[in-house]
Amino acid sequence: PQDVNVQIELAEYTINQNRDEILKDIYRRQAEMICFSCYIWNLDYVESMIRDVKKVMKDVIIWAGGPEVSYDSRETLGRLPELTGVMKGEGEKTFAKLCKVYGKHSETSELSLEQIDGITFRCPDGTICERPWRVPMDLSEVPFVYHDMKKFENKIIYYETSRGCPFSCSYCLSSIDKQLRFRSLDLVFNELQFFLDHKVPQVKFVDRTFNCKHDHAMAIWKYIQEHDNGITNFHFEVAADLLNDEEIRLIRQMRPGLIQLEIGVQSTNTDTIREIRRTMRLEEVREHVARIKEKGNIHQHLDLIAGLPYEDIKSFRKSFDDVYSMRPDQLQLGFLKVLKGSYMQEMQQEYELRYKDEPPYEVLSTKWLPYSDVIELKGIEEMVEIY
């Protein structure tokens, strides 16, 4: 935050690093406040690190944020007495407010935790206080973080031009955020040009359904085509059935390797698609994938999810064969993950859904798919990865 007198350091680690080395690095920085980002792939690691950090830095203030703690923030604080609080949902403005509370400031000295939306925190008397969720922010207000590209050498660049999702897929947290917002195209063009000028190898768009708004998608794809540097690749997650003729014609004209498309089919069982609240026109998916493949210039990655409701082993074989027949460049078989806060979690009893207690909460069995069939599909997953 520009109006707060605080020094912020970004410390990035991976779950493959030695825990002791990370702990030593955190300790050497001697921060007064530490914030951890919590995701499905790092939650166990982060919780263990929080406990260790508090043992060696007893006076440090520790906050957590991210999707893995946003939807059960009270339980997280109960489980981790080392935590002062949890940031729920979007963190940009919430973090800035926390900096005002804890930073060395004068004009905002009256600000207290009780006035900040989007947090759950431990009160001085030990009780847990929960504030309302923060109103979704204007995406054009999100700062651009890639000014110093030396810090991101040999790394994939993750970039966002929209938040929220128009769909309601029951297994996905994006369906909770119904307020679909887009970043200003002027900002997007400037930032894309920055990546192109620096000749970054890949920019991965994290928009949940990039082509849900035709004008937005076309403007960005046209800019990428017209300013192609011959090096940078752009990755998009799209709904293939939403692609229209104009978009497909443009995609077919692009340099081989300029963009790649990830298409989540998940299942071709109509009962499954209906039950998970997904909207998909399979024949249009098939037709559009074929039209793009015909030109041979675009890498297409298609996804399936095992363990969805109404999908038994026989049904999944058909889904697999249907997607395989589309001849994608890559077919990925994943397994249902029952995410906190998702509708799938609410329906676990009705679906007789059994899943692992630890992240990533992967399915073990359902009313339609016994564990013996999950084992068989695991073998298929390994073969798909190899070949």
Regions found by a protein language model. Give the residues of each.
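Short helix-loop-beta junction
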Residues: 1-7
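Conserved C-terminal portion of the radical SAM core fold
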Residues: 33-35, 61, 196-206, 231-237, ...
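A short, sequence-level motif marking secondary-structure junctions
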Residues: 133-139
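Short, solvent-exposed turn/loop segments enriched in Gly/Ser/Thr/Pro and often Arg
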Residues: 13-14, 39, 208-212, 240, ...
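Glycine-rich beta-alpha loop elements in corrinoid/cobalamin-binding modules
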Residues: 9-133
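Residue-level signal for the nucleotide or nucleotide-sugar donor/cofactor binding architecture
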Residues: 17, 90, 183, 212-215, ...
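Radical SAM [4Fe-4S] cluster-binding motif and immediate context
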Residues: 140-294, 298
